[in-house]
Amino acid sequence: MSLSLPPALSELARALPYSRTQWLPILVGFLIGYPLLIKALRYKRLGEMKKKFYFPTRESMAEMTDEEAFLIQKEMAQLEFPFMFLTSGQFALFRTYGIPTISHLLTKTGQFSKPETSFKRYTDTAALIGEMVENSPTSQRAFISVARTRFLHSGYQASGKILDADLLYTLALFAVQPVRFIENFEWRTLSDLELCAIGTFWKSLGDALGISSEILPSGKTGFKDGIQWLEEVDVWSQDYEAKYMVPDPKNRESADQATAVLLYNLPKILHPIGLQFTSYMMDDRLRKAMLYEAPSPGWSAVFSSLLATRKFVLRYLSPPRPAALAVSNIAQKPDKDDRYHRMSWDALPFYIRPTFWNRWGPMAWISWLMAHPVPGDHGQKYYPQGYHIQDIGPKYFEGKGHKEIQEMMKELKISRTGKCPFH
């Protein structure tokens, strides 16, 4: 007895070879067209930015204002390259620990003496920088964060424990590290408009923080634009490292505490891989100064492949991030007590509001599985009530410096008006 297919299936079987032939051009067109479409959409935002902030020539960029630079950089940090902006900021701070004068001061203050203090210092630094870079240069929040940072540094500067050159070096890293990371690891390189914005913003912020750029080649005669300042501070920082980034046990001590923060939410079984990646992201000079071993050739190949794959996927397969999903790590508005909160946590949940999502969402489940605290645990230990900007810093500085901050803010409202810092 022979078996036969139902008429409908027989018809489908006869049509199938022809369907494959018909679908082949569509499939090929999709495989070619989709990556080209994604690439075009990704570059569309850069084109729109160039139209919105119209500086057609290098000469015209000399007129870029602090406010314009802030808006351009904010778009880069929140929409174009959020992951690398965050990562480069973390490694900028990490890199400063390769300078013995900096690492010795940190260990003497006791801020790296135990996990709670080192984790809070990391979060406090991130909060202050976030307030400075995510808010308009002429906003109250930016003024307070700049003034608070100046107050926290003032005592150490007066005693000679913080060197002016170390402050300029730290400022330089926060300006040049995003450029280096984006050039090496992102889906496109930066335009002159974006480079000028980074240089203009950080030069202006340095002025507000009282960090002089006079030591740079054009420091006394004047910089023509943000690109020139960025180029000169980049070269100067590399020369500074060549002289002062040398091996020291305190460098290693500071680096180990910082690495503990970066790897905190990684299962301990994966910590060796995390340490390999941390070493991979260092250059030879930094690695030697921190007394770290070079990553193995095998892991270096794996990390290089993963980063290259990420670059390809972002450039050709992943649509651009919509404005509704802009990445911001600080609350846009204060709560009823005029306090602000962090929106995410990397290690211990300092300044995180204990909402239902934060206590029961994916990040909370990861924390629970690793026996780590979640927002709201341990009473007020992790400041679930948030922060007043004027109180950010070590516990012994809480409630102090308010009068000095008010005086500094009066000065800032006169000196930092959002205009071009070069003219």
Curated annotation (Swiss-Prot):
It is a single-pass membrane protein. Its EC number is 1.-.-.-. Residues 1-22 are lumenal. InterPro entries: MPAB. Keywords: Endoplasmic reticulum, Membrane, Oxidoreductase, Transmembrane, Transmembrane helix. Residues 42-423 are cytoplasmic. This is ER-bound oxygenase mpaB'. It comes from Penicillium brevicompactum.
